[in-house]
C-alpha cells in the first residue's frame, strides 16, 4: 500500500472522528430549542466556514464561481440539497426505530448507495468487476457493511440491557424513513462526484491538491443549508412551544455560552468534510468512490470508540462491548482490504 493511499485512509479516519464527536458541544447547550442550536451551528458549518476558507484559497472568489455554467453548478447544489433532506430524516429515523437500529439501517444504505452508485453513474462499474483491485475494493465494501451490522447489533444489545427504547417506536414508518435517510444522505457523495469540474478548476488556479475540493463546499453545503435552515426556521415560526426570540432573551452569559458551543459543534461538523477532502485527494482517481465507504464506516467505528471513552457502555455488560469491539475490528479489516485493492 502506497504512502498516498495510507494517508488518504488516515485523513478519512480523522474526518470521521470529528463527525463522531461533533454533537458533544451541542449536548452542553442550555435552555435553547434544538432548532435554534442547530441553526447557529449550521450557519457556522454550512455558510461561514465554506465561504471563508474558499475566500482564502481562491485568488479571485467571485471570478471562480462565475466561471461555471448553471449546468455545472445546479447538480452540485441539488445533490447538496438532497443530502440536507437525508440529514432531516436522520433525526426522525432515530425517533421511530431507536439509535442503534436507525443508525445501522441508515448508515448501511447510504454506505452502499453512496459508494456503488457513483461508479455506475460514471459508467465505470466494470472496474469493480473486471479488475483485481476493483474486486478487492468491492469485497472491502461488503466487509465494512458486515462491520456496521455487527456494531449495530452491539448497540441493540446495549439498549436492551439498559432499557433504552425508541421515543415513538414504529417499525413501518421507521424503516421507510431509514431507507429515505440512507438514500438521500448519499447526496454528499454524488455532489462531490458532480463537483469534479470545480475541483479541476481550483487545481488550475494553483490551489494545493489537498484543498481543491473545499471551494465546491460553498455550493454543496449551500444546498444542504437551505433545507436544514428552512426546516428549522419554519418550525421556529409555526410551533407554539418554540421561539427564537425567547432563546435570545436569556441572560447574556448563557447566550454567549450557547453560541460558542453551537459554533464549536458547527466547526467540528465542518472539519469532517475538511479532512474528507484531504483523504479524497489521496485516493487514486479510479477508486475515488471509495472515499464515501471509508468515511461512513469510520464514522461508525469512531462512534463506537467515542461511546466507550465517554463511558456510555459502562452499564451495558460484557457481551455488548465484546460485540462492539468485534465490529470495530471488522471495519478496520475492511479499510485494509480496500487499501490493498486500491494499491493494485
From Swiss-Prot:
Single GO molecular function: symporter activity
A Pfam family hit: RhaT
Intracellular or extracellular location(s): Cell inner membrane
UniProt KW Transport keyword: yes
Topological category with respect to the lipid bilayer: Multi-pass membrane protein
Signal peptide boundaries: none
Cystine residue pairs: none
Transmembrane segments: 4-24, 38-58, 68-88, 101-121, 137-157, 175-195, 214-234, 259-279, 290-310, 323-343
Domain of life: Bacteria
Keyword vocabulary terms for this entry: Cell inner membrane, Cell membrane, Membrane, Sugar transport, Symport, Transmembrane, Transmembrane helix, Transport
Cellular compartments per GO CC: plasma membrane
Catalysed reaction, written as an equation: L-rhamnopyranose(in) + H(+)(in) = L-rhamnopyranose(out) + H(+)(out)
Family designation: Belongs to the L-rhamnose transporter (TC 2.A.7.6) family.
Biological role: Uptake of L-rhamnose across the cytoplasmic membrane with the concomitant transport of protons into the cell (symport system).
Designated name of the protein: L-rhamnose-proton symporter
Organism: Escherichia coli O157:H7
Originating gene: rhaT
